[in-house]
Regions:
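Structural alpha/beta core scaffold segments of enzyme domains
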Residues: 1-515, 571, 605-606, 610-613, ...
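Amphipathic, heptad-repeat alpha-helical segments used for oligomerization and assembly
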Residues: 257, 404, 408, 579-597
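Generic long, charged, amphipathic alpha-helical segments
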Residues: 389-392, 566-590
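Cytochrome P450 core scaffold surrounding the K-helix E-X-X-R motif
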Residues: 519-523
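Hydrophobic alpha-helical bundle architecture
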Residues: 526-527, 548-567, 589-592
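In a subset of proteins, long, contiguous C-terminal domains/tails are tracked
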Residues: 585, 590-634
Length: 634
């Protein structure tokens, strides 16, 4: 167990009464030997969390390419360091909340905000032993998720309490419950090593990654292993990833899970390599950058990607060309990669008789997905996007759709919306042929108008044809369900200028530029918002955020007063530099954009701090106390 582990639930007629009842529960806990960090968990004599394992290492996986020893023997220069990162939380503003109603007819309805209501339904079914056909989950607006709302905490409990009481039951977590009881991301220990020639060619790379899983196995170390070296073409690689259990809340996904942690280590060493070789850090990246056909550590060959394009866009930007004002100002650059995901998706497009369309999708909207899906439909049909009314359907009204995560929403649900629109287009062309009593081959749809290819007098707008639907067979409904492959990889390169107060250790960010390959930017302002949001979370991770764990294993800073996330007062305007290398495997070239933006900031900040104070920072967070300690120890 861990502090925050759920042990009891109470239903009452008011929150106040429930809190009073909770206070009457007296549990006597015996504090057993426990382990809070990776290094404690794998130390000799550490208490064993799970008897089915011989130690606290739940799994050990290896990715290998080429021969690392041969690669290191070719190197003129080797750099290696140890790195540590603290446990951090996703920091969504809306706490977990769910309402459950076990009806007299023995059906369950759940209202909740999550990243995947079908997954909530399926997991609630599994926990309660109730068929999925008896459970309906109605998705509510979500106040932030970032991977943290991909699992169940409350939904089965609300249903059980409802069954007992006969009334709908709502549970909303307090902030301390969110921080202590729900999945953060991993703390870590890493040892990373690079070898390179004096000309700058990276010959070999090795990483030893040990990630906290929390109380049960399942850290993002596998994703970290797949991402850590992927921005570069390196012939000889070895990555050992260890999933390690410890007495903390079970980890869950956090925006590009695992990738920011690994990138912090790798990109810090890339910067150090460039310095020791005497090479511009972006030139080093350009020389070694991954491109189409480069083999990753996983053995996958890259499709068309925009990695080097982000390096070059950053180098060409006026931010990089500008001079720093004083020696106290540091400049740092770092790059990152995220895998991007996909999954099952469904979309249904109902044509109204006035020419508008009600579009129902199965993906939760956590980053602007509804308007993006609407844009796919509008583009196919040539009608204004304002004529599309997008909504997220519940589990009874739209086909199964996988959760919104992995930067896969716009790719899979955008594609499903595209295919649903194609279905609408096909049916509407048939209706136009019926109205004009002509061959389907004679009609085409251009810019929202149905046109007869040989009779210029025959022309109807989409809305005009929609008005004829009642007389030509009734409603037109376009449907699509798919599970598309090829979501496209995401790369980003970030540049930051900051000032360090050497007396206090305070870091002030002066300028931040984030270049990212977005494929085709379907909604550029939303793409910018996703990039900016990821950067802000990465800055918080780099400078402030961490779980403070006391000797008893409890979190001591489980409030937003003490768990310090950045606000607008801590940040400059983030300059989002959109690089467009369209994904050839999507109808409109879409790549996921939501996650990779959080990957480079940790190392970019560390490299800029080094540039300012001359000390390499190898532990997160780099708060004022840590910076003062580093300066004093230099």
């Amino acid at each position: 167990m861990y502090k925050g582990h759920a042990v009891a639930a109470i239903a009452a007629t008011s929150a106040h009464a429930a809190e009073e009842a909770l206070a009457l529960i007296n549990v006597q806990y015996e504090i057993l030997p426990h382990v809070s960090t990776v290094e404690e968990a794998i130390s000799e004599g550490a208490p064993l969390l799970h008897s089915q394992y011989k130690n606290n290492i739940a799994s050990h996986d290896v990715l290998e390419l080429g021969d690392i020893e041969s690669g290191f023997s070719q190197a003129d220069l080797i750099v290696e360091r140890e790195f540590r990162t603290s446990t951090v939380h996703q920091g969504y503003i809306e706490p977990h909340s769910a309402t459950g109603w076990w009806t007299p007819s023995n059906k369950i309805t759940v209202w909740g905000s999550s990243q995947g209501h079908f997954q909530i339904r399926d997991r609630t079914s599994l926990v309660l032993g109730v068929p999925v056909s008896d459970i309906k989950v109605i998705p509510m607006e979500i106040g932030g998720g970032f991977g943290g709302k991909t699992t169940i905490y409350l939904e089965p409990v609300t249903a059980l309490l409802s069954k007992i009481t006969g009334y709908p039951v709502k549970i909303t977590m307090s902030r301390s419950e969110v921080l202590e009881a729900t999945g953060p991301t991993s703390g870590s220990y890493m040892h990373v090593k690079f070898g390179a020639t004096k000309e700058g060619k990276i010959t070999s790379a090795q990483a030893d990654l040990k990630f906290e899983a929390g109380a049960y196995p399942g850290s993002p170390v596998g994703a970290a292993s797949n991402c850590i070296f992927t921005p570069y073409a390196i012939d000889n690689l070895r990555i050992d990833g260890y999933d390690i259990v410890n007495n903390k809340p079970k980890t869950t996904a956090y925006r590009a899970p695992g990738a920011p942690i690994g990138s912090f280590a790798a990109e810090t060493l890339i910067d150090e390599l460039a310095e020791k070789i005497g090479m511009d850090p972006l030139d080093l990246r350009i020389m070694n950058g991954a491109k189409q056909g480069t083999t990753r550590a996983s053995g996958i060959n890259n499709p068309l990607i925009g990695c080097i394009e982000t390096f070059q866009a950053t180098k060409d930007h006026d931010h990089y060309k500008s001079e720093k004002a004083t020696k106290k100002i540091g400049r740092g650059v770092a790059s990152g990669f995220w895998i991007n995901g996909s999954g099952a998706a469904c979309a249904v497009a109902n044509v109204n008789f006035d020419g508008t369309i009600n579009l129902t999708i199965g993906s939760m909207d956590i980053g602007g997905l509804r308007p993006v899906a609407a844009q796919h439909v509008a583009e196919v049909l040539g009608i204004p996007v304002e004529n599309i009314n997008p909504q997220v359907g519940d589990t009874d009204t739209v086909g199964y759709t996988s959760m919104t995560g992995g930067s896969g929403g716009a790719f899979k649900t955008g594609w499903a919306s595209y295919e649903a629109a194609q279905d609408v287009k096909r049916q509407m062309l048939e209706r136009a042929a019926e109205v004009w009593e002509t061959s389907l081959d004679d009609i085409k749809l251009e810019n929202g108008f149905f046109i007869h290819s040989s009779d210029s007098e025959l022309k109807m707008s989409f809305s005009e044809l929609a008005s004829h639907l009642p007389d030509t067979g009734g409603p037109v409904v376009g449907r699509a369900n798919l599970d598309p492959r090829g979501p496209g990889s995401a790369f980003a390169t970030h540049l930051v200028d900051l000032e360090v107060d050497t007396e206090t250790g305070k870091v002030t960010i002066l300028r931040y530029t984030a270049a990212q390959d977005a494929g085709t930017a379907i909604h550029p302002s939303y793409v910018e918002g996703q990039i900016q949001g990821g950067v802000v979370q990465g800055i918080g991770w780099a400078l402030n955020e961490e779980y403070f764990i006391n000797e008893s294993g409890g979190m001591t800073n489980s409030s937003l007063l003490d768990y310090r996330m950045p606000t607008s007062l801590d940040l400059p305007m983030i300059d989002a530099l959109i690089v467009e290398v369209p994904n050839p495997l999507h109808p409109y070239g879409v790549r996921g954009v939501g996650e990779v933006a959080i990957v480079p900031p940790l190392a970019a900040m560390a490299n800029a701090i080094y540039d300012a104070i001359g000390v390499r920072m190898t532990e997160l967070p780099m708060n004022p106390a840590a910076i003062r300690k580093a300066i004093k120890g230099a």
